[in-house]
């Protein structure tokens, strides 16, 4: 939930800054132009663009792309977790299990999303374990060569 709040806050900040910049757009003047009186007391000058690139600029672009990729991975993981938790009461229904399977979420991730911290067969099956077991059988039927990375799974 914090991620969504931060994302909404960032969008609101950017949109506020953009609308403020648009209000001062009439104060832009080229370098060789005549003097313009502004009511805001600010005057922005537009300079000719050059082909020069600065190393700091290129470094920041790489960092932004890296951050973008990591953010997409985290958001996809959170979205998949929310999707599995939302549909977990319906995994017994084969159609819902197939819809989760279309997202290529393997049973190890489903196990993690259902907040099963460890696989303990001595306690007995709780509802989340039953859901995970049903999904595991469905996954193995469609992916016979798949091997689980969990230690105690057959």
Swiss-Prot record:
Residues 1-16 form the signal peptide. It is found in: Secreted; Host nucleus; Host cytoplasm. Induction: Expression is induced during host plant infection. It comes from the Eukaryota. A motif (RxLR-dEER) lies at residues 42-58. Belongs to the RxLR effector family. This is RxLR effector protein PITG_12737.
